[in-house]
Structures are given as structure tokens and as C-alpha cells.
């Protein structure tokens, strides 16, 4: 009976980014992280983060520090869609501007190395309705309501 209870305990897959644990990623320097990223991200980090990116990281750190334990931090709004997600951003809540509104994005470990803009769609996907007059040649035979 005890063996059955032991089997019921679920084991979750530990996150790794290119074979490196999240805890080790947090301890790495930017130079070591750059070796793990793809060429585009390496080039971007090699050229350096600008003042706006540094201020976003500072605001994210502050929001995480002020959050009560076991609670999500306050949402930090930003227009920086081209910011690469770094390991220190994991667990933060970011409002990414899509041109009209700020979409809330919770940064997860799987997002490391991607851009913030990839998680905030800038257009409304098309919902196709019924064809109207002039839509196609065959739509002439569709009865009007």
C-alpha cells in the first residue's frame, strides 16, 4: 500500500536552458550567458544594453523585492518589445505595449532568450465571417437576408 502512495507523487520536469539549470543561469555573468544564447541574442548583448533596458531591469528588481513572499510582483509596464528575456526576469509580471494596450505577461523560464514582443501580439487575428456581395464570383448566388 505504501508503494502505491509513493507512485502517486508527481515529479515535475526540472527546467534547463540548453542543459543548464535555472539556478546556475541566475549565477552566471552576461559573458557566460552569451555563450548559451543564439547568434542574434549574442550580438545584441555584445553591443550592450541601453539605458532604457537597464531601467526596466531595475524596476523589475524593485517590484520583485517589494512583493510579499509567495505573491506575484507588481506589473511593470514597458514599451520595450525588443528586450531580450534574461534569467533574472523570470517570475516578473511585465505589461508589454502592443500599440494600443499593455498586455500582461508573466515571465516563465521557457521564455529565456526570446523577445518581450513575441508574447504581446500587435494585431487582432482575423475572424472570417460569411462572404458578402462582391467577395467572390460565386458569392453572387448567395441569397441576401
UniProtKB/Swiss-Prot annotation:
Cross-link Glycyl lysine isopeptide (Lys-Gly) (interchain with G-Cter in SUMO2) residue location(s): 108
Organism from which the protein derives: Homo sapiens
Major location category of this protein: cytoplasm
Gene Ontology biological process terms, A to Z: cytoplasmic translation; liver regeneration; osteoblast differentiation; positive regulation of signal transduction by p53 class mediator; ribosomal small subunit assembly; ribosomal small subunit biogenesis; ribosomal small subunit export from nucleus; rRNA processing
Residues recorded as bearing N-acetylalanine in the entry: 2
Protein name in the entry: Small ribosomal subunit protein uS19
Subunit structure: Component of the small ribosomal subunit.
GO cellular component, one term: cytosol
Signal peptide, first to last residue: none
Localization, UniProt: Cytoplasm
Function summary: Component of the small ribosomal subunit. The ribosome is a large ribonucleoprotein complex responsible for the synthesis of proteins in the cell.
Primary gene name: RPS15
Keywords noted in UniProt: Acetylation, Cytoplasm, Isopeptide bond, Ribonucleoprotein, Ribosomal protein, Ubl conjugation
Family assignment from sequence similarity: Belongs to the universal ribosomal protein uS19 family.
Pfam families: Ribosomal_S19 (PF00203)
GO MF terms, alphabetically ordered: DNA binding; MDM2/MDM4 family protein binding; RNA binding; structural constituent of ribosome; ubiquitin ligase inhibitor activity
Amino acid at each position: 500500500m505504501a508503494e502505491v502512495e509513493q507512485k502517486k507523487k508527481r515529479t515535475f520536469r526540472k527546467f534547463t536552458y540548453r542543459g543548464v539549470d535555472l539556478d546556475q543561469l541566475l549565477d552566471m555573468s552576461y559573458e557566460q550567458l552569451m555563450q548559451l544564447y543564439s547568434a542574434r541574442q549574442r550580438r545584441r548583448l555584445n553591443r550592450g544594453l541601453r539605458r532604457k533596458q537597464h531601467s526596466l531591469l531595475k524596476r523589475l528588481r524593485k517590484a520583485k523585492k517589494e512583493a510579499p513572499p509567495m505573491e506575484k510582483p507588481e506589473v511593470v509596464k514597458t514599451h520595450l518589445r525588443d528586450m531580450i528575456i534574461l534569467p533574472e526576469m523570470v517570475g516578473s509580471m511585465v505589461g508589454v505595449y502592443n500599440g494600443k494596450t499593455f498586455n500582461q505577461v508573466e515571465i516563465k523560464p521557457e521564455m529565456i532568450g526570446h523577445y518581450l514582443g513575441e508574447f504581446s501580439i500587435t494585431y487582432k487575428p482575423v475572424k472570417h465571417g460569411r462572404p458578402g456581395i462582391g467577395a467572390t464570383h460565386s458569392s453572387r448566388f448567395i441569397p441576401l437576408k
